[in-house]
Amino acid sequence: MTTWSLRRRPARTLGLLLLVVLGFLVLRRLDWSTLVPLRLRHRQLGLQAKGWNFMLEDSTFWIFGGSIHYFRVPREYWRDRLLKMKACGLNTLTTYVPWNLHEPERGKFDFSGNLDLEAFVLMAAEIGLWVILRPGPYICSEMDLGGLPSWLLQDPGMRLRTTYKGFTEAVDLYFDHLMSRVVPLQYKRGGPIIAVQVENEYGSYNKDPAYMPYVKKALEDRGIVELLLTSDNKDGLSKGIVQGVLATINLQSTHELQLLTTFLFNVQGTQPKMVMEYWTGWFDSWGGPHNILDSSEVLKTVSAIVDAGSSINLYMFHGGTNFGFMNGAMHFHDYKSDVTSYDYDAVLTEAGDYTAKYMKLRDFFGSISGIPLPPPPDLLPKMPYEPLTPVLYLSLWDALKYLGEPIKSEKPINMENLPVNGGNGQSFGYILYETSITSSGILSGHVHDRGQVFVNTVSIGFLDYKTTKIAVPLIQGYTVLRILVENRGRVNYGENIDDQRKGLIGNLYLNDSPLKNFRIYSLDMKKSFFQRFGLDKWSSLPETPTLPAFFLGSLSISSTPCDTFLKLEGWEKGVVFINGQNLGRYWNIGPQKTLYLPGPWLSSGINQVIVFEETMAGPALQFTETPHLGRNQYIK
């Protein structure tokens, strides 16, 4: 039997010698040259948990993993990011699978383009990486509703993440389709998937003791035969245990290492230790700072985890971007939605550039590798294109007539229950409510998440979680009351995920009397939404545009397109679309000040740029080589 172990630089040998005394490891450099997907031909056993060690076939194995989410990275850059992972000395890719993106409507599945899971997994195998798949159904991942599809919320009695029949029936149908794609990619079928995670951090939710056994059985019944794992933070670990499933832990600091050495052992006895999520940074929320974690602290903690005889996964190795409206939110004391960038202060930047963390971790993993690491790929070029001044304009009020007949309802309808998208409701974007009023007074109601209130076309303020009332002034003549409501992102973590319906929730009141007879417009801003606005629908940009509005301009590129960062100085809040691709939201409250624009989404020649601005338009759009993610705050 081949036995692998670690030999490291003298400064770190003391801790390893202690492990030798304890019998955990036998010192020798790791030689990974034959233990890669394309070279391991004779497969029988797969990844196993035996005593303190993982075993892959007859070899002791350490998982040195990193997380990259295919859905947050342009497909054209998957190879670049995976090669950089391999060059850092890692041997395993981990990724979530987002149900909401793969099944946007009941029974209609999308695994094309940037959602081609199979192509991503097979590319990892080609590059020499094993794969741990995290298919949920709930994934958290700072995604809208934790990756669950919003159409589940059409059921007024829905209990997400439980064995409630309405939920499990939907999971079963989704898993029927998903696992038919995943099963052939497993290790025992010649693929790179060596382990599959059961749900995600359920111990912190823990509302139904029958739920985790149900998910485990749902995976196994559909042909999942590889090692099963759970993943929990320190608060949920003891409650997230499932019989026959290996428990792993999520943490960030050296102060939490006792969870590895003591708590994990107390929970499941003699089993391999695994940090499924070592958080290399953290996500950001609108209105907050840009969270960063010092590279020396990262190296110190990673070294301590490995010295403790544990496998590790770096979450995130490369964060990428919350393109479109996929970002999630948190709502404990206050509602806070996540920014567009998922840079995460990870090992690679949002644009895939190297960081001090990358260099230090590459040295570290290189020091315990028995073979030289492959050279890191060259950096991708960036380009500060010339500023772009929009020349055409379409106010939201003028755009409404091109959207077809509005939905008419006596009472407000929340976003998820709108009769659109084949009966699946609206998942993302904005929703506009209109009704007629004949008096002034106090307007009140529950708006999720942010509603701009208009009398005719004049903005009078906002309603949100903190501001639930607003004074409506007296206006002579026919008066239309309008509320433009934005879904800023459904909560992805916490106990209140069942309550994530968006738009107007319940009645809207004027002087405590419910308003009636609404006209409702679905503004999902998909590609099909903009196809209704031919060039003949736009007009020249006036000196003082009526807002909210769409602004149209063109970016001319004469050479091969490169990555760039879009800067919107003078603009306040909205969304940017390039050649039909939704780059995501911008907001001048920060911390994020630039939007990442991948080169593959541009073309040589003319590129169409559309900005939807809610409140204040700037003079131009600027492009820079350098991202600006906001004022730094060190994670403690």
UniProtKB/Swiss-Prot annotation:
It is found in: Secreted. GO terms for molecular function: beta-galactosidase activity. Residues 1-32 form the signal peptide. The active site is at E201, E277. Disulfide bonds: none annotated. Its EC number is 3.2.1.-. GO terms for cellular component: extracellular region; vacuole. Keywords: Glycosidase, Hydrolase, Secreted, Signal. Pfam families: BetaGal_ABD_1 (PF21317), BetaGal_gal-bd (PF21467), Glyco_hydro_35 (PF01301). The keyword Signal applies. PROSITE patterns: GLYCOSYL_HYDROL_F35 (PS01182). Gene3D superfamilies: Galactose-binding domain-like, Glycosidases. It comes from the Eukaryota. Its main location: secreted. One of its GO terms (biological process) is galactose catabolic process. Belongs to the glycosyl hydrolase 35 family. PANTHER family: BETA-GALACTOSIDASE RELATED. This is Beta-galactosidase-1-like protein 2.
